[in-house]
Amino acid sequence: MGKIRVGLIFGGQSSEHEVSLQSARNILQAIDGERFEVSLIGVDKQGRWHASQASNFLLNADDPGRIALRESGENLALVPGECSGQLQTAANAHPLAQIDVAFPIVHGTLGEDGSLQGLLRMANIPFVGAGVLGSAVCMDKDVAKRLLRDAGLKVAPFVSLTRSKAAGADLSAIVEQLGLPLFVKPANQGSSVGVSKVKREADLRAALDEAFRYDHKVLVEQAVIGREIECAVLGNERPRASGCGEIVLSDEFYAYDTKYLNEDGARVAVPADIPDEACQRIRGIAIEAFQALECSGMARVDVFLTPDGEVVINELNTLPGFTNISMYPKLWQAAGMSYRELITALIELALEKGRMDEALSRSCQY
């Protein structure tokens, strides 16, 4: 049996482009070369797909602050239909590699929000991670929190605002409703991009303006006092949860720079130094949230553990980072699963989901 052909898709047009490059580099280094043959598909900031080479697809690869995609002169196109998984040159339709399964690691908008997943679904290519619905729901913090709340899971009180609603909003009433401090964040962004912590009502308008730079909808959320705990979930219909890890901050909050550029801004503690009973509750809640939001493949579930032991869900990330300091792979490594085994498990789950989709009837019989 030949090797399974994996299309590793990375980069993208979002503000998390550079994070995706770091993740792709680590996945490429960890993947089992005896089982998988990798085609690198780099997406530049204009949305063009490039055929990348493993030996030189990154510039400044060892510097998270300057890492960049080396754009090839050969743009790619994806052929759907009977030639499912066929890559070809965009200029002259010259056939290149054909892929059996895609591993999208394009973080943020147009990669993690169901857009790329929809393209792969239409092209009939199995892919790692959540499907169209789960990806879109988890990306939209407003919709995700409403569904979690309806499922009986605890989330922080919040208000969602569009730009037009925010223009005429009574900010004093919002502060009175939610209290201070507040967090203001774009509804459809990850990696803490555009997030502000507001301690004074006078700063709320500026925080809204900053968040609206990145999205048309913004969340104003009550700050939760508690420890930041993360749990990794892996699986399709029978998901399992890892142990718990903790983000121990030295900065004000877990901002973009703290996550990816300043390794001294936070410390990742795996396992988290919390009571076993609390960790078991968090693991159960993580699986409930994973299923409530129609996730599959993988997700990192971020929660707060308050001083009185309450678990408040912050968010679910359906394409968690695979950078050097990312929590998702660290949690599974602590559970005894190596980086390589994790990558293999994710690809196998994608193929399993693809077989289930393929078995569905696509015609009406009377």
UniProtKB/Swiss-Prot annotation:
It catalyses: 2 D-alanine + ATP = D-alanyl-D-alanine + ADP + phosphate + H(+). Its cofactor is Mg(2+); Mn(2+). GO terms for biological process: cell wall organization; peptidoglycan biosynthetic process; regulation of cell shape. GO terms for cellular component: cytosol. Mg(2+) 2 binds at E315, N317. One of its GO terms (molecular function) is metal ion binding. It is found in: Cytoplasm. Keywords: ATP-binding, Cell shape, Cell wall biogenesis/degradation, Cytoplasm, Ligase, Magnesium, Manganese, Metal-binding, Nucleotide-binding, Peptidoglycan synthesis. Residues 145-348 form the ATP-grasp domain. Pathway: Cell wall biogenesis; peptidoglycan biosynthesis. Binds 2 magnesium or manganese ions per subunit. ATP binds at residues 175-230. Its EC number is 6.3.2.4. Cell wall formation. Belongs to the D-alanine--D-alanine ligase family. This is D-alanine--D-alanine ligase A. The gene is ddlA.
